[in-house]
Amino acid sequence: MSKRDFYEVLGVPKNASDDEIKKAYRKLAMKYHPDRNQGDAAKPAEEKFKEAKEAYEILSDAQKRAAYDQYGHAGVDPNMRGGMGGAEGFGGFAEAFGDIFGDMFGGARGRGGRQVYRGNDLSYAMEITLEEAAKGKEAQIRIPSWESCETCHGSGAKPGTSAKTCGTCQGSGTVQMRQGFFSVQQTCPHCRGTGKIIPEPCTACHGQGRVKKQKTLEVKIPAGIDDGMRIRSTGNGEPGTNGGPPGDLYIEIRIKKHDIFERDGDDLHCQVPVSFITAALGGEIEVPTLQGKAAIDIPEGTQAGKQFRLRGKGIKGVRSSYPGDLYCHIIVETPVKLTEHQRKLLKELDESLKKGGAKHSPSTESWTDRLKSFFS
């Protein structure tokens, strides 16, 4: 049987944001929770959840989503997480709930019974130039990192002492609480789910068993990246608790304002000033591009605002097959600080042009006619 479209499975459009995808998955996870689907409904619910889980795993990962968007199901490995098929069993089913409900309620249950928490995601803003965005680059960044405490060797206990089993939960990290007819399992309030009590905490790490330091990370910026895009570095967020998975690091790209170019998607725009003599008589001018210099032939009688397009002189975006174009917008420059001789020459030129009327200044003549019609 062919697989359904992943966007259809989650009920979201193809341009859905990460938050929309996550919310849709949460809704399905709650709907097909095993506690809500017993008896004959259990098996169909499990299949529905597996389908939603697979869709979420692909669409929540930027690289996998890009491959799926381009090639469909053939672009992603259906066994990338080692168990989408029927052999997964209830263990994998429960593990999948840990991913989503851990986000919702703070943590999932580990195999030893202790509360397992996923680490928090980290964000990092990186500023790059337009040239670096176009070509791509490799950079180093420093981010906070947790390392095992050298004083207590990660135990959290003062040297010479050791952690004790929590007497409240007997080391399980959870306690049973009765609410009417129901018995609810909750995190032990005494040890906070660790199953251990540290009578004498290590003074270096304050009983955490780890200390915060800085680490250097190599980051590859892909060519064509645009302002506001994020790069996900899996597992480089804050570490999890009690064996929980680490969070992710999201690097947000910010592109510095350029002195010459403005970016619009894959296209670039720039303003090119030319003298009114060149605009009137025409000629060749030199313009800058990200690849170097280029020449443009300015035709005779070029007006201010005229736009010239240089194909392929823009930027090739991250998901683009071809580079964009460069648009040069002409600004006709009016001369300033004229000498008396220059003023005289311009006045003579003006008188000569006026005699030609619409022949030399079609826009001015048309404007004059419209004004006469307006005030008449």
From Swiss-Prot:
Q: Which InterPro entries match?
A: DnaJ, DnaJ_C, DnaJ_domain, DnaJ_domain_CS, HSP40/DnaJ_pept-bd, HSP_DnaJ_Cys-rich_dom, HSP_DnaJ_Cys-rich_dom_sf, J_dom_sf
Residues in CR-type zinc fingers: 136-214
One GO BP annotation here?
chaperone cofactor-dependent protein refolding
Q: Report keywords, A-Z.
A: Chaperone, Cytoplasm, DNA replication, Metal-binding, Repeat, Stress response, Zinc, Zinc-finger
**Start and stop residues of the CXXCXGXG motif repeats:** 149-156, 166-173, 188-195, 202-209
Q: What is its main location?
A: cytoplasm
Pfam families membership: DnaJ, DnaJ_C, DnaJ_CXXCXGXG
| Bias-annotated ranges (Gly residues) | 237-246
Q: What is the free-text note on the cofactor? A: Binds 2 Zn(2+) ions per monomer.
Q: Which residues bind Zn(2+) 1?
A: 149, 152, 202, 205
- Report the record's disulfide bonds: none
> Domain J spans what residues?
5-72
Q: Where is the stretch described as Disordered?
A: 227-246, 352-376
Q: Name one GO cellular component term.
A: cytoplasm
The record comments on the domains as follows: The J domain is necessary and sufficient to stimulate DnaK ATPase activity. Zinc center 1 plays an important role in the autonomous, DnaK-independent chaperone activity of DnaJ. Zinc center 2 is essential for interaction with DnaK and for DnaJ activity.
Q: Entry's PANTHER family?
A: CHAPERONE PROTEIN DNAJ, DNAJ HOMOLOG 1, MITOCHONDRIAL-RELATED
What protein name does the entry list?
Chaperone protein DnaJ
The organism named in the record is Acidovorax sp. (strain JS42)
